[in-house]
């Protein structure tokens, strides 16, 4: 399946279609959108965002704890869309506080 992904970035919102077997970060780059990242392996917080609507599968990541994921935080480098989803990007500072 393919879902609509909306990213709310500091430069404004962007929308694109993302297959459910492609990481959101990878698809964003394919579409020409530059997002923050570092390890690309779900092991740091550089790419962190916050899910505002919809659901993702980020089971490949290991940096976020259950409470952080329950709060909506997502690592875009290891997140597959599970529905149409809206994510606020550039949330590393909110996460690490």
UniProtKB/Swiss-Prot annotation:
Gene Ontology CC annotation, any one: chloroplast stroma
Highest taxon listed in the record's lineage:
Eukaryota
Q: Boundaries of each 2Fe-2S ferredoxin-type domain copy?
A: 3-93
Q: What is this protein called?
A: Ferredoxin-2
Give the cofactor binding note: Binds 1 [2Fe-2S] cluster.
A GO molecular function annotation here is: metal ion binding
Primary location recorded for the protein, binned into one broad class: plastid
Annotated NCBIfam families: fdx_plant (TIGR02008)
Tell me the GO BP annotations in alphabetical order: electron transport chain; ferredoxin metabolic process
The UniProt keywords, alphabetically, are:
2Fe-2S, Chloroplast, Electron transport, Iron, Iron-sulfur, Metal-binding, Plastid, Transport
Which family is this sequence assigned to? Belongs to the 2Fe2S plant-type ferredoxin family.
Q: Give the matching PROSITE patterns.
A: 2FE2S_FER_1 (PS00197), 2FE2S_FER_2 (PS51085)
Looking up Pfam families in the UniProt record yields: Fer2 (PF00111)
Secretion signal span = none
* Cellular compartment(s): Plastid, Chloroplast
Which cofactors does this gene product need? [2Fe-2S] cluster
According to its UniProt entry, what is the function of this protein?
Ferredoxins are iron-sulfur proteins that transfer electrons in a wide variety of metabolic reactions.
Ligand binding ([2Fe-2S] cluster): 39, 44, 47, 77
Look up the coiled coil feature and give its residue ranges.
none
């Amino acid at each position: 399946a393919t879902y609509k992904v909306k990213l709310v970035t500091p430069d404004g919102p962007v929308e694109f279609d993302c297959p459910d077997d492609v990481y959101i970060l990878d698809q964003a780059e394919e579409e020409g959108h530059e997002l923050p990242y570092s390890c690309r392996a779900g092991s740091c917080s550089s790419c962190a965002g916050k899910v505002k609507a919809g659901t993702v599968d980020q089971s490949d990541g290991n940096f976020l704890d259950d409470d952080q994921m329950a709060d909506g935080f997502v690592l875009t480098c290891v997140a597959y869309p599970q529905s149409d989803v809206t994510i606020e990007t550039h949330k590393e500072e909110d996460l690490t506080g």
